[in-house]
Amino acid sequence: MAKEGIKLIANNKKARFDYFIEETYEAGVVLHGTEVKSLRMGKCSIKESFMRIENGEVYVYNMHISPYEKGNIFNKDPLRVKKLLLHKFQINKIVGQIQQKGYTLVPLTIYLKDSLVKMEIGVARGKKLYDKRQDIAKKDQKREAEKDFKVKNL
């Protein structure tokens, strides 16, 4: 995500730990002015958020955007349902994928691309407990190898 003109706002690490991400999409987010200002300050959480497709449109629920401090009466509800902007063929493809048993749609990251707020969403399949244990074991092995390498270089 360290590309030119992209500023990461929030990352959903738990989604990558709990799911196998099969395919990702970039979607625009429909927001009001004070929500954008709050996002630019980095006050957003997508840990507990989830997505639904209703009437051919994708919505994000429980995405918490803290109220803008100077927003007074213009502030919206922090947990307001937000609409995502995707092409019709992308939505149809996602619907076909998540109708399969075990697949769901999860928010992965939210970021600013130039001046636009974008969300990376993924079609995901849930991991079993042993898959999570394997990931933890791999992470520990990698950490140990880096530690040994660092000691040898001194």
UniProtKB/Swiss-Prot annotation:
Cellular component annotations (GO), alphabetically ordered: cytosol
Annotated compartments: Cytoplasm
GO molecular function, one term: RNA binding
CDD domains documented for this protein: SmpB
Keyword set includes Protease: no
BP GO terms, sorted: trans-translation
PROSITE patterns tied to this protein: SSRP (PS01317)
Keywords in alphabetical order: Cytoplasm, RNA-binding
HAMAP family: SmpB
Family of the protein in this entry: Belongs to the SmpB family.
Protein name: SsrA-binding protein
Organism: Lachnoclostridium phytofermentans (strain ATCC 700394 / DSM 18823 / ISDg) (Clostridium phytofermentans)
Source organism phylogeny: Bacteria, Bacillati, Bacillota, Clostridia, Lachnospirales
